[in-house]
Each structure stands twice: as C-alpha cells, then as structure tokens.
C-alpha cells in the first residue's frame, strides 16, 4: 500500500484514539440543597427569572439607558471581551496540532565558474510535504480539550463582568439618587431652621424668648450648612463613580429623588433549590477550569507512552524548467518516526503530579465558589425581610416625630416648653428622614445583589 493511501487511514485512527484523561464527575455541592426562606412575599414561582434580563428587572428607563451606554463603552467589559477572543484563538492554535500539516516548496539555483569559462548550471525543484502526529494516546486531543475548556471559562468570566457591570451601574445610579435626595432634605431642613430662627428672633424682641434660644437656633443652621456641604461632595463623588462605569464623560442625567418602584422585585418559590447556583457564570467558569485541569491529566499521562509521527512528501528536480514536472523527475519519501520515553529524570512523573495537584486545586476552587455564592444569596435573603421590617418601623417612627414636632412648636409658642424641645424634635425628624432614605437605598441595593447573586443580569 502506498503512503498516500496509508495517510488518511492513520489520520482517522489518530483522531479517534484513546484518551487517558480521567472520567469527569461534577463534585457534590458542599451546601444545603435548599435555601431557608420565609414565606413572606415569596409566593410566585420564578423558574425563568434567570432568563429575565436586566431590561425586565429594571423598571426605571433612566437606568436602562445608562446600562446600555456602559455595555458599549466600559473598558473592563471591553477587556474581558478581548480576552475571550484571545482564548478562542489560542484554542484554534492548539487544536490545529491534531491535524496533518501540508506545506509546498519550490526553489531554483544557478551556479557557474567565476572565470566564466564553463556553462552555468541550473537546478529547479518543487515539493509537497505532509506531516502528522499519530495521537494514539490522546495527548494532543486532551491538550486541545483543555484549551477549549479554558476558552469556555473565559466566556463565562466575560459574562460575569457583564453582570457585575449591570449591577454596579444600577447601584451607582441609585447612590446618585440617594445623595441628591439627602441634599434636598438637608436644604429643606435649612429653610425650616431659618424660619425658626426668624421666629425666635421676633420673640426675643418682644421678650417672649431669650438669647440662649436664639444662639441654639443659629447653631443648628450652621450645622445644617455643614451637612449640605457634605452632601454636595457626596453627590459629586457619586457622579464621578457613575461616569467611570459608563466609560465616558458626557452629560449625566439630572439626579432625582429615590423611587421605590425602580426595580421589579425578584419573586422566589419557598423551596428554592441551591442547584440554581450552578448557572452562575463564576461557578460555570470554575467548572470549565476544572474540566481543563481534568484534560491536562490525560495529556500528562500520554507523555509516558510512545509518540509516533509520519512525514511524507513528493518532489521533482530538473535542470530545465520546462521538464520540471515530467514523471521521470519525480521522487517520493515516507518517514515514520517513533519516540519512546526511556529516561528523563522524573520529568514526566513531575508533570503528572503537577496536573493532578492542579486538578485538586480546581475542585477546591469550584467548591469555594459554590459556598461563596450560597452565602451571597442567603445573606441577601436574610437582609431582605430585615430591611422591609426596618423601613416599616422607621415610617411609623417618622409619622410619630412629625406629630411630636407640631406639638412641640405649639407648646413653645405658648411658652409651655423651651426652644430646646423644638430643636430636639427637629433634629430627630431630620435624622429619621435621612435614615429612611438610607434604608430605601439599602433595600434597592439588596434587591440588585439578590438578582445578581442568583445569576440574573
């Protein structure tokens, strides 16, 4: 049988050769099978919520616009996308070694005596060479599989960056809203304090008040001005953070007060399975890395066995270019080669040990990712009900303080209490309004964190 007929058979045999990689088994999840959920507000099944993209989750159109802009311009996401392209090219490069390599060549030479008393000698040649490594033990196949899994892991890493960017832009936007709302409350409070100061000043002129009350009124005005300056700085910082995430420094949307209806609340079944975590991109990335480590063990094991390569070629040579392709000028060659590892001072065993240890490290990393993901979801679920309870209590407290302030002002006007009682009520009301804003912002951030932790985005 000629080499040309042997080569396709060898290629087919090598491509279907055995693999020495261990059979892959997904590690057991080192977390409970279900999350502990209260029944409050968790009644609607949400089997498809992971497929509900951020355009569905975020109701606020301004948020959607900002996220769309960030997905186009953000440098972190752009870098992650380039890494995916690099990993894809690396996989193609490694996979190419599994297939025959075919190269053509041609050359011509002219030679003669320097004295010019002999005729010029000419020589022309062409050739076609093929080479192929018979991958009987799966070394190249496993190396290719490892690169494929690395490429898939990079894709999941890019998806994780995408989800994180969506989350960060939304949180930054709501932080801007919070800073603006706190500034608005501080400015409103300053106006109220200034009105109180004017009232106390009039009472001082009529003898119904004293200098101490006037100084107290002036003191809270200056304190509130200081708070306004602080809130202005926080708003500027929030704008800077948002612009960095957007990847551009164009005009930001006008800040608005916090809207509690900016998000579509995540509805969860009472018996939420922890299996849902397996769809998170960071966990899928870790699993692909584990599969790559598994394939590397197969490549390391194959190094203990012989490697066989085939080289074949056809060529022609002639002193006359016109007769270069005559049948009489053609030649062929077929060169099989086998390399058998005999002694390498333990190099192959060390490579296998490294591959096995890295596979064990990948298992630990995979389990850690699952445990961290479980904690993120469990924390968000626990905080969810706590924040709702805190907000309800704070709203009742705010209503009580508003009544207290009204009564304190009425009593002060009739001389029944000192101005200090009014100041205490105003300070408490101001602080409670700020706290309620903080709690509403925390609830929004927690909803975003829960949505992200469950793999949404």
From Swiss-Prot:
Entries under Gene3D superfamilies matching the protein: Outer membrane efflux proteins (OEP) (2.20.200.10)
Pfam families (UniProt xref): OEP
Highest taxon, organism lineage: Bacteria
Lipid attachment, kind S-diacylglycerol cysteine: 18
GO biological process entries: copper ion export; copper ion transmembrane transport; detoxification of copper ion; intracellular copper ion homeostasis; protein homotrimerization; response to copper ion; response to silver ion; response to toxic substance
Annotated keywords: Cell outer membrane, Ion transport, Lipoprotein, Membrane, Palmitate, Porin, Signal, Transmembrane, Transmembrane beta strand, Transport
GO CC, any one term: cell outer membrane
Variant or mutagenesis effect after changing residue 27 to S: In strain: K1 / RS218
Lipidation (N-palmitoyl cysteine): 18
Membrane as UniProt keyword: yes
Impact after mutating residue 191 to G: In strain: K1 / RS218
Signal sequence interval, chain numbering: 1-17
Annotated phenotype, changing residue 106 to D: In strain: K1 / RS218
Keyword Manganese: no
Molecular-function GO term, any one: copper ion binding
Subcellular location: Cell outer membrane
Role: Forms pores that allow passive diffusion of cations across the outer membrane. Part of a cation efflux system that mediates resistance to copper and silver. In pathogenic strains it allows the bacteria to invade brain microvascular endothelial cells (BMEC) thus allowing it to cross the blood-brain barrier and cause neonatal meningitis.
Assembly mode: Homotrimer. Component of the cus efflux system composed of CusA, CusB, CusC and CusF.
Family that this chain belongs to: Belongs to the outer membrane factor (OMF) (TC 1.B.17) family.
Misc. comment: The cus system plays an important role in copper tolerance under anaerobic growth and, under extreme copper stress, in aerobic growth.
PANTHER family recorded: CATION EFFLUX SYSTEM PROTEIN CUSC, OUTER MEMBRANE CATION EFFLUX PROTEIN
Name of the protein in question: Cation efflux system protein CusC
Organism name: Escherichia coli (strain K12)
Taxonomic lineage from the root: Bacteria, Pseudomonadati, Pseudomonadota, Gammaproteobacteria, Enterobacterales
Gene that encodes it: cusC
């Amino acid at each position: 049988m000629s080499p040309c007929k042997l080569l396709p058979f060898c290629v087919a045999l090598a491509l279907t050769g055995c693999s020495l990689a261990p059979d892959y088994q997904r590690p057991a999840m080192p977390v409970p099978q279900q999350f502990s959920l209260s029944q409050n507000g968790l009644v609607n099944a949400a089997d498809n919520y992971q497929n509900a993209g951020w355009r569905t989750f975020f109701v606020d159109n301004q948020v959607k616009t900002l996220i769309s802009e960030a997905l186009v311009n953000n440098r972190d996401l752009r870098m992650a996308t380039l890494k995916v392209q690099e990993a894809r090219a690396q996989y193609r490069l490694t996979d190419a070694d599994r297939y025959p390599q075919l190269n053509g060549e041609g050359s011509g030479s002219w030679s003669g005596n320097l004295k010019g008393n002999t005729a010029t000698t000419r020589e022309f040649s062409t050739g076609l060479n093929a080479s192929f490594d018979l991958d009987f033990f799966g070394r190249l196949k496993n190396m290719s599989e490892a690169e494929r899994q690395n490429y898939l892991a990079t894709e999941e890493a890019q998806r994780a960056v995408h989800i994180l960017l969506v989350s960060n832009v939304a949180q930054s936007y709501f932080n801007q809203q919070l800073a603006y709302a706190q500034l608005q409350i501080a400015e409103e409070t300053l106006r109220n304090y200034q009105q109180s100061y004017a009232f106390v000043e009039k009472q001082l002129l009529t003898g119904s008040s004293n200098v101490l009350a006037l100084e107290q009124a002036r003191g809270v005005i200056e304190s509130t001005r200081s708070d306004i300056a602080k809130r202005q700085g926080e708003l500027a910082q929030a704008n800077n953070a948002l612009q960095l995430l957007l990847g551009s420094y164009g005009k930001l949307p006008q800040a608005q007060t916090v809207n509690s209806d900016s998000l579509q609340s995540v509805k969860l079944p009472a018996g939420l399975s922890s299996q849902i975590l397996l769809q998170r991109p960071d966990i899928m990335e870790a699993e692909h890395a584990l599969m790559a480590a598994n394939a590397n063990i197969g490549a390391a094991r194959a190094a203990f066995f012989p490697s066989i390569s085939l080289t074949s070629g056809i060529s022609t040579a002639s002193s006359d270019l016109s007769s270069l392709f005559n049948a009489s000028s053609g030649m062929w060659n077929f060169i099989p080669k086998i390399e058998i590892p005999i002694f390498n001072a333990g190099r192959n065993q060390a490579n296998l040990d490294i591959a096995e240890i890295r596979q064990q490290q990948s298992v630990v990393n995979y389990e850690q990712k699952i445990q961290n993901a479980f904690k993120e979801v469990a924390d968000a679920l626990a905080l969810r009900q706590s924040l709702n309870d805190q907000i309800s209590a704070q709203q009742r407290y705010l209503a009580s303080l508003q009544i207290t302030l009204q009564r304190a002002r009425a009593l002060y006007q009739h001389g029944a209490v000192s101005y200090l009682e009014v100041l205490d009520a105003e300070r408490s009301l101001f602080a409670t309004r700020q706290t309620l804003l903080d709690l509403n912002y925390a609830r929004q951030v927690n909803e975003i964190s829960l949505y992200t932790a469950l793999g949404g985005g």
